[in-house]
């Protein structure tokens, strides 16, 4: 063995000894750490038992959701003396009259703001909202919790005043900390039309207080949207376009402290769940106040809320656990031959859109875009000035049609279900369902375009044998709103499809017309 080999062997032995010593030290250190940890835990346990009062220590502290630490969450709402002095019987009556239910895990028990006088806001915002007679139920109940920085789930029908319900507290929080830069308020909405509508309402408030607001959605170039995003504190967006902008690095959501998901159930129906989760991950949960507004409260929406909301207060207006129609809407259902529907439509327009009713707004629903395009041509041929929103039209054409209808340039609007939810079109007097939608739930959302903000309205529906599998569900909705049920509809059967089991198959429940009906529940 050469000298070099002997030296090399010695080096290897030394190296192995060093490694062994390091391992031994690490083992001793780990053992010591475990002992100290055990002693510490034992001392803590003894301390908590002191005074013969045993205190239960949570086993998994890390599983608890972090409490918000943002400026938004640290703002505390102070209830006015005038509101505090109201007798409890007045509050109870208000809850009963408006079918309000509040689930309050924090036991705050904040009273609803029955009048704008009980609300203390910046004078410019106060002046804007005071143009209305009084807060809507969702506003009255949600505002105290939102102004206190709490997470809130609002379950209420479309047209209940949800935009101001989340918009007023959002602007109020912004004004309390005007030094911050970047996007602080983010509202996510399922459709371009609804996003534009929310933007139109919010910009009234942001303009009053010198804040910048922008709206981003697909179907238009991104360049202008990128510019607006850099200047805005308030952003209204559809999930798809916002995610595109995030992935290309054009938007920073790290400063968002007020997040709103509007029409959450609708977004899940449209398959946006993963997009929403990816967007939310770009915000800071520790300083984020989160709001969710939804017309229904199915399992999927509940699960989404549980993943990113912190002890949310749930405010429900109306019978939201079951599918119900607005009782201010007169529902008329006619069973007709499918071949005569368009002829029948012309008769209905003479009834609802001529003479003294010539200037009343009428919204007509078709099921598919091809049907809508055909009906649009037919009505124009018959001399009607009609605007239309359906899939064969460009975004610019759809926006123009909606603006014409809102402004009164055209008082007839033909739409597919793209416009069935969320669009706040004031003073729609009549909804005509030329073709029944694919679900009874969509029917309720369609007719909800009328009878809004305390007004009355009419929904006239043409029902054919092709939709007979939906007859039982429609009967339930009619009965639930105390509306007449035509004999021709009952002839199709009064059962509703309730469940489907992989082994048992579909099974049904008959509607007992002698009793108050059990309304449809969507699991």
Curated annotation (Swiss-Prot):
One BP annotation, GO = rRNA processing
What's the EC number here? 3.6.4.13
Per the record, the coiled-coil ranges are 20-54
Residues spanned by motif DEAD box: 262-265
List the GO cellular component terms. nucleolus
Q: What's the main place this protein lives?
A: nucleus
- Helicase C-terminal domain mapped to chain residues: 344-493
Q: Where does ATP bind?
A: 156-163
Q: Which UniProt keywords apply?
A: ATP-binding, Coiled coil, Helicase, Hydrolase, Nucleotide-binding, Nucleus, Ribosome biogenesis, RNA-binding, rRNA processing
Query: Which SUPFAM superfamilies does the record cross-reference, listed alphabetically?
Result: P-loop containing nucleoside triphosphate hydrolases (SSF52540)
Q: Where is this region: Disordered?
A: 1-71
Domain comment in the entry: The Q motif is unique to and characteristic of the DEAD box family of RNA helicases and controls ATP binding and hydrolysis.
Q: Which PANTHER family match?
A: ATP-DEPENDENT RNA HELICASE DBP3 (PTHR47958)
Family, as annotated: Belongs to the DEAD box helicase family. DDX5/DBP2 subfamily.
Name assigned to this protein:
ATP-dependent RNA helicase DBP3
Q: Which organism is it from?
A: Saccharomyces cerevisiae (strain YJM789)
**Gene name of this polypeptide:** DBP3
